[in-house]
Each structure stands twice: as C-alpha cells, then as structure tokens.
C-alpha cells in the first residue's frame, strides 16, 4: 500500500507522516509538497527507506491527479482554501482520502467517490475528528440525546504556519455563513464571540471563556444524532488569552472584514497584511503554553433517566519533560495523530462505506 502525504512538509501533516512511519505497514510514504526544500527536510527527519518526496502543486490538477493515481490513499494536510481542489483531484484519481478541515467542500464529490468504490473522510484531526468520536462514544450510550456541547482549547502560536493563519482569519470573519449552532431542527447563524461559556479544561490549561466557532461537528453531529431527537449542538473554542485579546480587538475595529487598503501603489486585504506580519514576527511564532485540550458534554436519557457525560482529553506535558512532545509538537502531534490513524483504517479496508463520509459514520 502507498500513501501520499499531501502538504506533508507542513508542521501538522509531517507529524501524521511520523506516526505512519512509526506504526503503519505502508510500503511507500510519499511526502508531497509545493515547498521542495521543506519536503526534503521532512524526508531526512523521518529517516526511513519507505519515505520519499515528490513536488506537487495542487493548483495543477493534471499533475496532481497523475501523482495521486500512483497511491492508494491521500492523507491531505493542505489548507482549507485548497481542500476543494485537493478533493476534486482525489475523486478524479480514484483513490481514498482523508483531511483535517472538513468545512464542507468535499461532500459535493460524494457521487464520484461512490462510483469509484472509494472512501473520503473530511475533518479528522482533533477538532473536528477526535471530538466527533467523543460525541459518538457518549451518545451511543444514550437512548435519546438533548444537548451536545463540544469545546476545545488550542494552545498554539497565532501564526506558526500559513494554514493556521488562514484558519484564524476564517473563523472570525464577521460575515461567515458557516458559524452556526443547531437549535430545534435549524442551523442558526451567529456572530463572532457569540454565546460565551466558561469551560474548565484539564490541567494545566484551566478555565477559559469559549465562543461559538464554525466547525464541522455542528453539522456532522446533527446528521448522526437526527434519530435521537437532539435539540441543541454548540461548538466552541479558544486560543491562548493573548491570541483571543488580539482577535477581539481586530474584530471590534473592523479588521476581520479584511477590507482592501492601499499601501503605496499596492492594494491588499488588511488581515492578509496582518497575517503576513504575524508569520514573520516573533510574537506570532511563540506562546507561553503549548498543547491541545478537549471538553465534550453530552446530555440525554437512558432507561427513562436523564444523564450527562463529560469527556476530556489532554496529552504529555509540553515543557520538555517528555521527549517528542516539546512545545509546538504537543499541539501538532495531537492534530496529526488522529489523521494518521484514520488513514490506516481506511487503507486497510476497515471502513466499508463508500463516498464522502462524516467521521461519525466512518469510524
């Protein structure tokens, strides 16, 4: 079996590739990336004879499809703005797929994947991904489900990669239609910083105000739990306090609209400029506490009694006391490992459903 790690030079996808090297039976693990120097650096870091590098530009569909056709599955770590193109390439190439974001562009390719007898699972990192499994674990123990609240703390620098910078701008876009809650059978659009709720995360992360965010779990959980009468689904998140302070100020002052401004003879989106600055500034590349913590609450009934499940997640300390989990790797490994596990499960034939499948049905 051969796997193509698309965007494999990225900080998160390389961790998924590392997990495949450590635990999978793939005969070939190809790092596919536009950035050749970073990609070859990952190959050297992984130091395994099964690993090679192929340069690929997802915007070049013909080239990308040809490369994908040489592989059984694509583990897609590209940015959310590229997921439409990358999924289209997988569908045409006739290979299995999985990605991190799951924001919705992938589902329009369902028929193509079904026709080719292939499976694609969008949104399988930490959030969405592991959170979907936590909701499913709790809900499957209940006869009816009334409330689902998914919350997370992503403790990472605000702009350590292009993908993360893009995600930050996307999630707090004031006009984003996908920032919704599910309430009494309807998806209701809400503004940034809507419905604040204090969430107590596992140590060392503590209690933080969290706000509604545009994540796939709202829609996938609604689909999975439709037969159990679910009335409310809310997905919240937070970043380090300094990050949230900055995003709130940018939102209050209108920067998050990303209006075009003229600088000299050049016109640029103001958030695009701020994002580029943060990617080059030390303040955008570091944070005080690293890692990822999840908190999932599911309320329902069993045997005629009302019950509540609260599930949490954490990981080895990021302070250097545990090798391989130092600082940023405590965050990136948390996101990469679930995608690697999902990749192995799909490639090994454990997922019988074909088409583009939500995580709750796939796993």
Feature roles, as predicted:
Residues 10, 35-37:
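Helix N-cap at the beta1-alpha1 junction of Rossmann-like dinucleotide-binding domains, i.e.
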Residues 101-120:
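Rossmann-fold NAD(P)-binding glycine/threonine-rich loop
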Residues 89-107:
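ADP-ribose/adenylate-binding Rossmann-like module
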Residues 46-60:
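Rossmann-fold cofactor-recognition segment
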């Amino acid at each position: 079996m051969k796997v193509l790690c698309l965007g494999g030079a990225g900080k998160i996808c390389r961790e998924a590739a590392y997990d495949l090297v450590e635990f999978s039976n793939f005969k070939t693990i190809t790092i596919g990336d536009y950035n050749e120097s970073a990609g070859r650096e990952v190959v050297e870091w992984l130091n395994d004879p099964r690993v090679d590098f192929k340069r690929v530009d997802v915007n070049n569909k013909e080239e990308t499809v040809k490369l994908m056709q040489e592989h059984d599955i694509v583990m897609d770590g590209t940015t959310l703005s590229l997921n439409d193109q990358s999924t289209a390439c997988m569908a045409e190439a006739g290979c299995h797929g999985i990605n991190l974001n799951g924001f919705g562009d992938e589902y329009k390719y369902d028929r193509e994947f079904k026709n080719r007898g292939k499976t694609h699972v969008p949104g399988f990192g930490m959030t969405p991904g592991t959170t979907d499994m936590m909701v499913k674990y709790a809900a499957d123990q209940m006869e009816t489900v009334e409330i689902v609240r998914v919350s997370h703390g992503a403790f990472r620098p605000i702009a350590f990669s292009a993908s993360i910078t893009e995600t930050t701008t996307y999630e707090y876009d004031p006009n984003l239609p996908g920032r919704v809650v599910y309430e009494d059978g309807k998806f209701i659009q809400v503004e940034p910083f809507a419905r604040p709720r204090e969430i107590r995360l596992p140590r060392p992360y503590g209690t933080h105000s969290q706000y509604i965010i545009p994540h796939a779990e709202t829609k996938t959980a609604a689909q999975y739990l439709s037969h159990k009468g679910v009335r409310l689904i809310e997905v919240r998140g937070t970043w380090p306090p300094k990050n949230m302070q900055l995003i709130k100020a940018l939102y209050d002052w209108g920067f998050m609209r990303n209006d075009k401004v003229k600088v000299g003879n050049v016109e640029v989106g103001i958030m695009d400029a701020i994002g580029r600055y943060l990617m080059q500034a030390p303040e955008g590349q570091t944070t005080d506490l690293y890692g990822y913590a999840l908190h999932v609450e599911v309320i329902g009934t069993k045997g005629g009694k009302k019950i509540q499940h609260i599930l949490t997640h954490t990981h080895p300390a990021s302070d250097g006391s545990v090798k391989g989990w130092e600082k940023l790797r405590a965050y990136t490994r948390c996101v990469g490992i679930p995608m690697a596990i999902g990749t192995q499960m799909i490639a090994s034939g454990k997922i019988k459903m074909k088409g583009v499948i939500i995580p709750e049905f796939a796993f």
